[in-house]
Amino acid sequence: MLSSQTSSIFTVSRLNQTVRLLLEQEMGQVWISGEISNFTQPASGHWYFTLKDDTAQVRCAMFRNSNRRVTFRPQHGQQVLVRANITLYEPRGDYQVIAESMQPAGEGLLQQKYEQLKAKLQAEGLFDQQHKQPLPSPAHCVGVITSKTGAALHDILHVLKRRDPSLPVIIYPTAVQGDDAPGQIVRAIELANARGECDVLIVGRGGGSLEDLWSFNDERVARAIFASRIPVVSAVGHETDVTIADFVADLRAPTPSAAAEIVSRNQQELLRQIQSAQQRLGMAMDYYLANRSRRFTQIFHRLQQQHPQLRLARQQTALERLRQRMGFALEARIKQANQRQQRVSQRLSQQNPQPRIHRAQSRIQQLEYRLTENIRSRLSEQRERFGNAVTHLEAVSPLATLARGYTVSTTTDGKVLKKIKQVNAGDIMTTRLEDGWLESEVKSVTPGT
């Protein structure tokens, strides 16, 4: 029997581990409400305490990195709301709660409702910027929805009176705390819209706890503000207090006094602005008049300068100056022309061709004489050389030889006959005599002995 169940036997360690995993996986993170007891804080900075109610208790631990975010010091017997993870301490088998956050029990429940409503309205788009209405500038009438006996109304009226005493203010008194407050606030918003007397509404109250401000976290109030055709400025509590009404309103003011500052004009500042504008206007007028005066003076002077007599006088003066300039220019031109004429005359006198012609003629005559003499000398030399050449030629000329009785015979191809072997019997040859030529036929060839 025992052997059949051995597969289901757990060791203590395995059992505690399995239970721990089951607790962590199945339970996850939960909210626990209970009373604190046995609170301790060792040197490590961690918190150890017990949460209990009338019939049960559980051990809890809150580590230092989590408890440093808690804004209060837990006390023995204090009711708190704890967000925690359920686990088991395996070495001892003790199941315990590991706290992640802690709030006083009353505020914790309200905070949870606050977060749920905020998420719901945000998902519906009530906080979207596209739905925000612009505030009138300036406002002509301000409606105030708050308690008629609260400090908030006093602060609002004080600021409005200081900044803009002439600004009309209509008070819609309501309760701002308690069970009846949300309904009264809704009816006041609806009444202001129905009467249409104001062009901006301030909805708010002074500071307080989360429970004190809870009327402005009511869904009915939020939807009434969203539905208002008149722009709404929320002014609930202090700057650190943020309500659902602040998210839905067209503009959130950190305090009621700040809301009054936002919707009103500062008459003193407005007066200073008017005085400044008047001063700037006066300066602009002075500048404009001075500018116009300067312009008038300029035009007057221009008209005076353009008077016919003045223009005629200026033209006569200009004409006289022009005449003088023309006279000076003419004299200068004449002077320049005379100077140029003198320079040209000097250059012409320096470049007169007559002396050069005389010098050229003398040079030509000299060259002609020298050329004639040279030709004569050359001709004499040539005659002498020619005579010598003739004498020499006559001495060696064949004609002279022919005159002495000799002859010269040549073959038909023009070769001079020097030997008998150059011809044969029957050949034709030509013989040159002193006074002519003979053509003869060789009858026979006889060698000399």
From Swiss-Prot:
Enzyme class: hydrolase
Any one GO MF annotation of this record: nucleic acid binding
Chief localisation class: cytoplasm
Entry keyword Cytoplasm: yes
HAMAP family cross-referenced by the UniProt entry: Exonuc_7_L
Function: Bidirectionally degrades single-stranded DNA into large acid-insoluble oligonucleotides, which are then degraded further into small acid-soluble oligonucleotides.
Family affiliation: Belongs to the XseA family.
Protein name as it appears in the record: Exodeoxyribonuclease 7 large subunit
Species this protein is from: Salmonella paratyphi A (strain AKU_12601)
